[in-house]
A protein has these predicted regions:
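PAS/PAS-like sensory domains
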Residues: 51-55
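Acyl-donor (CoA/ACP) binding surface of acyl/acetyltransferases
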Residues: 1-32, 56-161
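Conserved GNAT-fold acetyl-CoA-binding loop/helix
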Residues: 28-48
């Protein structure tokens, strides 16, 4: 998957080029906020495993090719542990100096539009106090479905087709 927008290139990270994500490792709190880790640290081995088993997308600026962040599409599972076809949960993170400039809205919207063309459902879980992520999800046509115990909200992207 490779998507180009006005300002960005969003493309899949493969295990062999996961080292390009090294600049993100110093922002461990972003991985926690994105729900990708609850304890411990994310390292290149962890990212390599994610790149092999899930869909890890890097976000880069078109002109400079500078790494801005990640979008990760995680398989969704039913109650028996079986993978739900055509359904992903999204997690994302952006370098702090690049936040609040519309980059994540632009990237996530483009990715979701591409997935929508294949009738793929995208959901997200976000803490109720994470106003920035809630704003991104709202701007990308997600709607709040439910609030779970622990202030975790479940959002689902509306079908745009």
């Amino acid at each position: 998957m490779k998507i180009k927008t006005k300002r960005l290139i969003v493309e899949r990270v493969h295990r062999q080029n996961v080292i390009e994500l090294t600049p993100l490792l110093k922002y461990q709190s972003l991985f926690q906020q994105a729900g990708l880790v609850t304890v411990g640290k994310v390292d290149l081995v962890t990212l390599g495993i994610l790149a092999q088993t899930e869909c890890v997308l890097q976000i880069r600026e078109r002109g400079e090719q500078g790494l801005l962040g990640l979008i990760i599409l995680l398989h969704s599972y039913d109650k028996t542990g079986a993978i739900l076809p055509k359904q992903y949960e999204v997690g994302y993170l952006l370098l702090p100096r690049k936040q609040h400039q519309g980059y994540m809205t632009e990237a996530l919207s483009a990715v979701c539009d591409q997935l929508n063309r294949s009738q793929i459902t995208v959901t997200a879980e976000v803490r109720s106090d994470n106003a920035s992520s809630i704003g991104v999800l709202s701007r990308c046509n997600f709607i709040r479905i439910t609030i779970n115990p622990g202030m975790i909200e479940l959002w689902k992207r509306q079908d745009m087709g």
